[in-house]
């Protein structure tokens, strides 16, 4: 889970860059801090739904975040 928290600020910046003038960044950070992973996942999936708006490493970072969430969630379910 630590890796997810380390990557969250990077994802927040990507979201902020694509949603200027909104509270999207704050909402994403809030979701991560409070463990609202369904909300965080929905925001990232929304960004990935329009990949033509993403630049450089952004798409790969968003996908990496989703993969890490899936791994962490499956570990928590097994426990």
What spans do the regions from the language model cover?
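C-terminal-biased regions
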Residues: 1-79
């Amino acid at each position: 889970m630590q890796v997810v928290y380390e990557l969250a600020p990077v994802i927040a910046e990507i979201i902020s860059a694509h949603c200027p003038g909104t509270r999207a960044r704050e909402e994403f950070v809030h979701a991560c801090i409070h463990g609202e992973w369904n909300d965080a996942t929905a925001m990232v999936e929304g960004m990935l739904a329009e990949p033509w708006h993403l630049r450089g490493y952004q798409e790969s970072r968003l996908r990496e975040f989703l993969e890490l969430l899936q791994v962490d969630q499956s570990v928590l379910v097994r426990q």
